[in-house]
Amino acid sequence: MNLRQQLGSGLSMAMVLASAFAFWKLFSIVTMSNSPIVVVLSGSMEPAFQRGDVLFLWNREEYVGVGDVVVYKLQEKDIPIVHRVVREHRVMEKDRKTKKKVQKQLLLTKGDNNERDDLPLYAYGQQYLERKKDILGRVFGYVPLVGYVTILITENVYFKYALMALLGLSALVQDE
């Protein structure tokens, strides 16, 4: 393979990666969610969602209601959690920047397959999730079991190495 072909292959790969990144950013802007697509990692939401389901999030609503399934991130952890809103209330607070009173929505969540609410998961002293600060989005659609590839890659080291070897082998075979 000559230099021109290598540069062409590299440019093609860069275009694929740039297109994927652009699609992700566009989807993030449209849904107003930093994480518009998530994979269910546990069975806490069964039977509504199974482990491995891919969820699509929407974060354009001002408020979410009791019964809505939301995805939130805890302050200390990087893993998004998919649970249902079981209680909500609103409080009036003074906005720090504008000094005007604003209504803030507070939420309590629980997994459908869990016996108790999520209070023990929240940060020490935190009673509720704040809609604007903690919620990544409300679930508006899903694709069953497609996310199992992600789970296999993160949980099984051998699968990850086999997949990388397969990708490397396919790149070598394609070049010939």
Swiss-Prot record:
This is Signal peptidase complex catalytic subunit SEC11. The gene is SEC11. Keywords: Endoplasmic reticulum, Hydrolase, Membrane, Protease, Signal-anchor, Transmembrane, Transmembrane helix. The lineage of its organism: Eukaryota, Fungi, Dikarya, Ascomycota, Saccharomycotina. It is found in: Endoplasmic reticulum membrane. GO terms for biological process: protein targeting to ER; signal peptide processing. NCBIfam families: sigpep_I_arch. Residues 31-176 are lumenal. Component of the signal peptidase complex (SPC) composed of a catalytic subunit SEC11 and three accessory subunits SPC1, SPC2 and SPC3. The complex induces a local thinning of the ER membrane which is used to measure the length of the signal peptide (SP) h-region of protein substrates. This ensures the selectivity of the complex towards h-regions shorter than 18-20 amino acids. SPC associates with the translocon complex. It catalyses: Cleavage of hydrophobic, N-terminal signal or leader sequences from secreted and periplasmic proteins.
